[in-house]
């Protein structure tokens, strides 16, 4: 059934929003995996765990915003299978932050690709939505995680377990 509210919403944009929604859910799922790993009794880096838990919730909220947007534009939300995270074990905080940085860059590139598609299909509403809700936040997250990686290396990771402990106790907590 065709939506009565649909206007100037290209089917390619609708499909791309559904793919973006799925990617945000995958990111949330991956961050949940990281949270569970760092919260384990044999890892016990609770502030790092909380950082990933917060990011999981944030990515889930992003997915929900895409659902709401899809419905507002008269599109149809089509959920797809969410891929399992690439790992179950995340090693140390440095490895996990490097994986998180790559994930954020992947999400950012997908957002930029969606913005280009919206521009090509002359959809100023979708462009505005992406610019106001996502693009700046992605750049901030990439910078924040990049800074964490720099500081983790400065603390001697992956060789220095004390550096990882200090990072958990001070760096992640202070940046919240």
Curated annotation (Swiss-Prot):
The keyword Iron applies. One of its GO terms (molecular function) is ferroxidase activity. Its EC number is 1.16.3.1. It catalyses: 4 Fe(2+) + O2 + 4 H(+) = 4 Fe(3+) + 2 H2O. InterPro entries: Ferritin (IPR001519), Ferritin-like (IPR012347), Ferritin-like_diiron (IPR009040), Ferritin-like_SF (IPR009078), Ferritin_CS (IPR014034), Ferritin_DPS_dom (IPR008331). Fe cation 1 binds at residues 24, 59, 62. It comes from the Eukaryota. One of its GO terms (biological process) is iron ion transport. The keyword Iron applies. Oligomer of 24 subunits. The functional molecule is roughly spherical and contains a central cavity into which the polymeric mineral iron core is deposited. PANTHER family: FERRITIN. Stores iron in a soluble, non-toxic, readily available form. Important for iron homeostasis. Has ferroxidase activity. Iron is taken up in the ferrous form and deposited as ferric hydroxides after oxidation. This is Ferritin, middle subunit. It comes from Aquarana catesbeiana.
């Amino acid at each position: 059934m065709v939506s009565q509210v649909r206007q100037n919403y290209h089917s390619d944009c609708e499909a791309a929003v559904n793919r973006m929604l799925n990617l945000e859910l995958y990111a949330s799922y991956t961050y949940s995996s990281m949270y569970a790993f760092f919260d384990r009794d044999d890892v016990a880096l609770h502030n790092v765990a909380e950082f990933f838990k917060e990011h999981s919730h944030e990515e889930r909220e992003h997915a929900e915003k895409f659902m709401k947007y899809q419905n507002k534009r008269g599109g149809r939300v089509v959920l797809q299978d969410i891929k399992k995270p690439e790992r179950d074990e995340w090693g140390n905080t440095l490895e996990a932050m490097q994986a998180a940085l790559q994930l954020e860059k992947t999400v950012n590139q997908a957002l930029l690709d969606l913005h280009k598609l919206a521009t090509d299909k002359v959809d100023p509403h979708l462009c505005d939505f992406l610019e106001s809700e996502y693009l700046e936040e992605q750049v901030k997250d990439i910078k924040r995680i990049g800074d964490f990686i720099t500081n983790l290396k400065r603390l001697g990771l992956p060789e220095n377990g004390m550096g990882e402990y200090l990072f958990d106790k001070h760096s992640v907590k202070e940046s919240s």
